Regions:
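Catalytic cores of peptidoglycan-degrading enzymes
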Residues: 1-108
Length: 108
């Protein structure tokens, strides 16, 4: 919320609305939904107890239960939920622990 400091899990990656979002790694889509804060989101379970969350999407392409491969387009960038502009909010989890995605992804 504006004026309130909170720990921010994950990273925000600015991109034009409608930009395709590729899956981080092979996995299975475990949830597709919408919340007031995340807007439209999708979560994917990966081998080894890892999972990823992609939020503020304008459109979700993959469906719950689908098997996806690294790089598959699973959604599109948007600004749904609490967002000040179009971007991808990306989280990486190991079990219930939040990991800093910056150590695991290349933004190049």
């Amino acid at each position: 919320m504006e004026g309130e400091e909170r720990f921010h899990y994950g990273i925000d990656i600015g991109a034009a609305a409608g930009t395709e979002i590729g899956c981080f790694a092979d996995g299975t889509v475990t949830a597709v939904g919408e919340s007031s804060s995340y807007g439209k989101y999708i979560t994917v379970a990966h081998e080894g107890g890892y999972s990823t969350l992609y939020a503020h999407c304008s459109r979700i392409i993959a469906s719950s239960g689908a098997s996806v491969k690294e790089g598959d387009v699973i959604a599109e960038v948007g600004e749904t939920g609490v967002a000040t502009g179009p971007h991808l909010h990306f989280e990486l989890h190991e079990g219930s622990q939040y990991l800093n995605p910056i150590y695991y992804v290349s933004l190049a």
